[in-house]
Regions:
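Pepsin/retropepsin-fold aspartyl endopeptidases
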Residues: 1-48, 53-144
């Protein structure tokens, strides 16, 4: 999993599976730190995500996972991953719902990272289900 900002290009994505009616594209502005941060909802609880197109799946910190009601002590951390802070092990989970900027997806594959992840990541297991993801120098547009 990487922490690099989204590339400045347009990338139409296939496989949007939202149960909600089509919505307008939502804009996420680049933060002062150079990253795109998104306020989302997972299973009805707020989570602040770093948008990471280099992450293959949504990745949760143990603290966020616990706030969502996941029993992190009972998860099986057997999936090796690579983060900017080094190698770690993660536990695979499935999230009932993930919503960001009006785009709600059901049954989203995710991992809970055992250590080394400073913030939860909004990765491709969610982003890849959008109908369109457009990145410019300053803005990320999410089209459900």
């Amino acid at each position: 999993m990487s922490y690099s900002p989204a590339p400045a290009r347009e990338a139409p994505l296939r496989g949007a599976q939202s149960s909600d009616p089509p919505a307008e594209a939502a804009a996420i502005a680049k933060a002062a730190d150079g990253h795109f941060w998104a306020e989302g909802q997972v299973n009805g609880s707020r989570v602040r995500f770093l948008v990471d197109t280099g992450a293959s799946s949504v990745a949760l910190t143990p603290m966020d996972a616990q706030r969502l009601g996941l029993n992190t002590g009972r998860l099986i951390y057997d999936t090796p991953i690579h983060t900017a802070n080094g190698d770690s092990l993660a536990a695979r989970v499935r999230l009932a719902t993930v919503s960001v900027a009006g785009a709600r997806m059901r049954d989203v594959d995710a991992v809970v990272v055992g250590r080394g992840l400073p913030s939860s990541l909004l990765g491709m297991s969610y982003l890849g289900r959008l109908s369109r993801l457009t990145a410019t120098q300053d803005t990320l547009l999410l089209q459900p």
